[in-house]
């Protein structure tokens, strides 16, 4: 497209420009260059062009750009809103930091033990007086009111403060609460005897104990022999042990375990497994792994037999023994355990083992401390130890018996429902309390008069007078 000039150029270009037969040279001659100018081709061309358009009635060359309008003065830019919010944001951050510090201090105070109560120094009379009214607020001047930020700025500032404070306070308080929860939480009642570390179950405890001992934790084979654990009687004074037998609570299982294990109660089986027995008997010092077995063991120290057979009225100390006895009345007792020596059958494996030790075995591991006798079972050793105890006479027949068997011997004189006691004149099938008291008094008198007879020759009295000895009477068993 050709530019449209402000002047009318309807004539052919050559006559108008004077470019007829004379050519460009004629045009140059019609507009001679001005005098005093340097012969610069560009300047000469520009002057010729301006003269040409001036002769044609154009005030300005169409090829020259219009002069740019003068710049209009602009109003100074208003300060951005962020400049006004800088003090508000700074105050919000300071308040968030103060809130986080206050939350951390409150958590530390809650975790610390309570301090002993001190004497109060607060004036209670002053507390009962009504509080003084607050001072009136200072008047607000008009320029200050005009200088207040607009509502939109206040809304944005409040939103910014809320967005800054909420996450900061949550992040500051959450780690403190989680740390306190981890510190106070207990893992379990299984405690390592060497480093006091707690575990939830016995398997994890055994795996941990393998680190201290170097032994590989594993299952105990079925044929492994468990060695009995004896607790020193000095440990019975520990509060955890004395309460473990009666209550059986979790406190005795937790705190008492560490105390007993430190005293050497942890035993090791033939396979290398360590067994902790926390509950000790107060009478003999034998330890057990739980309260159930301890209470069952305590029945052996008493004459109580709470379980009675409904068929023959025979009494038992343990319920399982009574159940096996009741099955014998029906003739349906299954005895799968056979002795390889004599072919005798038993209903329980412990009965078979006891039979083999007592009848067929020549090993005598239980030895008497007062003589050279040895026995295959602990029960037989206990029965033999009674021979070395003090003898008491029977008030009926005068036979000298041990104090442990005097009650059983009195039943010999009171067998049958038609027996009449010589002391109370009552017919009874049990031991008379008056007869038992008389036997105890006679035993005390006999012990005060003379020393108990022994199987060794004769003994010397307190004043050197020999006391005649008599042979030991036959035992009721």
From Swiss-Prot:
Interacts with BPTF. This is Myc-associated zinc finger protein. The modification Phosphoserine is found at residue 361. The lineage of its organism: Eukaryota, Metazoa, Chordata, Craniata, Vertebrata. The gene is MAZ. GO terms for cellular component: nucleus. It comes from Homo sapiens. Transcriptional regulator, potentially with dual roles in transcription initiation and termination. Signal peptide: none annotated. Gene3D superfamilies: Classic Zinc Finger. PANTHER family: MYONEURIN, ZINC FINGER PROTEIN. Present in kidney, liver and brain. In the brain, highest levels are found in motor cortex and midfrontal cortex (at protein level). Its main location: nucleus. It is found in: Nucleus. Keywords: DNA-binding, Metal-binding, Nucleus, Phosphoprotein, Repeat, RNA-binding, Transcription, Transcription regulation, Zinc, Zinc-finger. Residues 130-141 have a biased composition (Pro residues). It comes from the Eukaryota. GO terms for biological process: negative regulation of apoptotic signaling pathway; negative regulation of transcription by RNA polymerase II; positive regulation of cell migration; positive regulation of cell population proliferation; positive regulation of DNA-templated transcription; positive regulation of gene expression; positive regulation of phosphatidylinositol 3-kinase/protein kinase B signal transduction; regulation of transcription by RNA polymerase II. Residues 59-78, 121-146 are annotated as: Disordered.
């Amino acid at each position: 497209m050709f530019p449209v000039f402000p002047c009318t150029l309807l004539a052919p270009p050559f006559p108008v420009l004077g470019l007829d037969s004379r050519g460009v040279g004629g045009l140059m001659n019609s507009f001679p260059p001005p005098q005093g100018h340097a012969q610069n081709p560009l300047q000469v061309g520009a002057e010729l062009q301006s003269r040409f358009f001036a002769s044609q009635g154009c005030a300005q060359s169409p090829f020259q750009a219009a002069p740019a309008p003068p710049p209009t003065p602009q109003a100074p830019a208003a300060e951005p809103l962020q400049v006004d919010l800088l003090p508000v944001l700074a105050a919000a951050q300071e308040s968030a930091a103060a809130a986080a510090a206050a939350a951390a201090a409150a958590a530390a105070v809650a975790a610390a033990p309570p301090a002993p109560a001190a004497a109060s120094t607060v004036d209670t009379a002053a507390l009962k007086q009504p509080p003084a009214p607050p001072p009136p607020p200072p008047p607000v001047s008009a320029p200050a009111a005009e200088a207040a930020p607009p509502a939109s700025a206040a809304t944005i500032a409040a939103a910014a403060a809320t967005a800054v404070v909420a996450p900061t306070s949550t992040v500051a308080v959450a780690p403190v609460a989680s740390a306190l929860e981890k510190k106070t939480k207990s893992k379990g009642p299984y405690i390592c005897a060497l480093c006091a570390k707690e575990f939830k179950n016995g398997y994890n405890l055994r795996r941990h104990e393998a680190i201290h001992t170097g032994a590989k934790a594993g299952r105990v084979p079925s044929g492994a022999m468990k060695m009995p654990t004896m607790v020193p009687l000095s440990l019975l004074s520990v509060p955890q042990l004395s309460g473990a037998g009666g209550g059986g609570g979790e406190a005795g299982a937790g705190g008492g375990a560490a105390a007993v294990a430190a005293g050497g109660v942890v035993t090791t089986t033939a396979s290398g497994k360590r067994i902790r027995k926390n509950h000790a008997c107060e009478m003999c010092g034998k330890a057990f792994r739980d309260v159930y077995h301890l209470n069952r063991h305590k029945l052996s120290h008493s004459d109580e037999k709470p379980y009675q057979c409904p068929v023959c009225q025979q009494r038992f100390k343990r319920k399982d023994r009574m159940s096996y006895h009741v099955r014998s009345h029906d003739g349906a007792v299954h005895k799968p355990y056979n002795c390889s020596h004599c072919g005798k059958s038993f209903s329980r494996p412990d009965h078979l083992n006891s039979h083999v030790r007592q009848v067929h075995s020549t090993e005598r591991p239980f030895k008497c401390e007062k003589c050279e006798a040895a026995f295959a079972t602990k029960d037989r050793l206990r029965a033999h130890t009674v021979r070395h105890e003090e003898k008491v006479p029977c008030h009926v027949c005068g036979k000298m018996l041990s104090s442990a068997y005097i009650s059983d011997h009195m039943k010999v004189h009171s067998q049958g429902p038609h027996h009449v006691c010589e002391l109370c004149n009552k017919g009874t099938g049990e031991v008379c309390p008056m007869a038992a008291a008389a036997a105890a008094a006679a035993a005390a008198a006999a012990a005060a008069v003379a020393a108990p007879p022994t199987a060794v020759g004769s003994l010397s009295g307190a004043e050197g007078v020999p006391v005649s000895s008599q042979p030991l009477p036959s035992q009721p068993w």
